Amino acid sequence: MTNIRKTHPLLKIINTSFVDLPAPSSLSSWWNFGSLLGICLAVQILTGLFLAMHYTSDTATAFNSVTHICRDVNYGWVLRYLHANGASMFFICLYLHVGRGLYYGSYTYSETWNVGIILLFAVMATAFMGYVLPWGQMSFWGATVITNLLSAIPYIGTDLVQWIWGGFSVDKATLTRFFAFHFLLPFIISAMVMVHLLFLHETGSNNPTGIPSDPDMIPFHPYYTFKDILGFLLMLTALSTLVLFSPDLLGDPDNYTPANPLNTPPHIKPEWYFLFAYAILRSIPNKLGGVLALVMSILILAIIPLVHTSKQQSMIFRPLSQCLFWLLVADLLTLTWIGGQPVEHPYIIIGQTASILYFLIILILMPLISTMENHLLKW
């Protein structure tokens, strides 16, 4: 008799996706981050659901409701810090996942890559709106500054900003709608993840060598299920350590002060995972130019498949491209550092240099070096 997992309509889908799926035998730990992102999403949805049961999205009570969760709700502090630091783990895994895609040329699977870019934007939007909800100083001023950027759009900008605010400033209407969208988006993200996996399973997974692995495949279960479980344990250990020993390490102390529209914090900055984009935004002295650079810093990922000039998919056999890749990583770390610094000399010029270098590496140097490597290999 055929196994039920191969005949049952629902189990059949799970079976072909996670059990009998043929996977390349050479996948390294860099291929763990997709499943880690799935766990992050599950943790965020679960902790977020329980937090939403006690949170009130009203300017008068939002800050106090978060305090109430931490002080009075059973294990509320665990939920709150798991959710806040879970977002950081989410972005660490997300950036490593994208970095893996860049290094090993996974962007050649264009549908999977493009859905991934949409997912990245959706997760960033969700995280931004979530940061506004505790209604601390940095929540309020972060929301004011970032939403105000839309006013740089010619002609419709001001109307658009007021439409998003639901008034003439960030206020109760803004907080309520941000809560509604923050609750809704993770479920849309979950649906998009299904689409992401659907497209991935159409082509099959890439592998570290960049060489087609059709002759050498192994079943996903038990090999990669156990490998993924090990990844889960390591990540959840790191998250638990962060939550239980140093929950405020990645947060901003200003957010423990209730929002006050009459008092601007000395340095308005987003959470650490947006600092690289924030540094690019600040490095251009023109509002519209800054906004375009900010959007392009992420949207440039969609252009990468178009500027792939190498005859090889992966960078594993291309040492010059590897040097450029790690230069890009160092550049992004520099931008992250600059984004958290005040706008003064020498940080301004460092930020501007790093921003130019970011676009230069991706749009000009990478394609040039790839073409040069083709000639060196006489291809």
Curated annotation (Swiss-Prot):
Binding residues for heme b b566: 97, 196
Transmembrane helix is among the record's keywords: yes
InterPro entries: Cyt_b/b6_C (IPR005798), Cyt_b/b6_C_sf (IPR036150), Cyt_b/b6_N (IPR005797), Cytb/b6-like_sf (IPR027387), Cytochrome_b (IPR030689), Cytochrome_b_C_euk/bac (IPR048260), Cytochrome_b_N_euk/bac (IPR048259), Di-haem_cyt_TM (IPR016174)
Cofactor: heme b
Annotated residues for binding of heme b b562: 83, 182
Localisation: Mitochondrion inner membrane
UniProt similarity note: Belongs to the cytochrome b family.
Subunit structure and binding partners: The cytochrome bc1 complex contains 11 subunits: 3 respiratory subunits (MT-CYB, CYC1 and UQCRFS1), 2 core proteins (UQCRC1 and UQCRC2) and 6 low-molecular weight proteins (UQCRH/QCR6, UQCRB/QCR7, UQCRQ/QCR8, UQCR10/QCR9, UQCR11/QCR10 and a cleavage product of UQCRFS1). This cytochrome bc1 complex then forms a dimer.
Protein purpose: Component of the ubiquinol-cytochrome c reductase complex (complex III or cytochrome b-c1 complex) that is part of the mitochondrial respiratory chain. The b-c1 complex mediates electron transfer from ubiquinol to cytochrome c. Contributes to the generation of a proton gradient across the mitochondrial membrane that is then used for ATP synthesis.
Miscellaneous section: Heme 1 (or BL or b562) is low-potential and absorbs at about 562 nm, and heme 2 (or BH or b566) is high-potential and absorbs at about 566 nm.
Protein name listed in UniProt: Cytochrome b
Species of origin: Mormoops megalophylla (Peters's ghost-faced bat)
Gene expressing this chain: MT-CYB
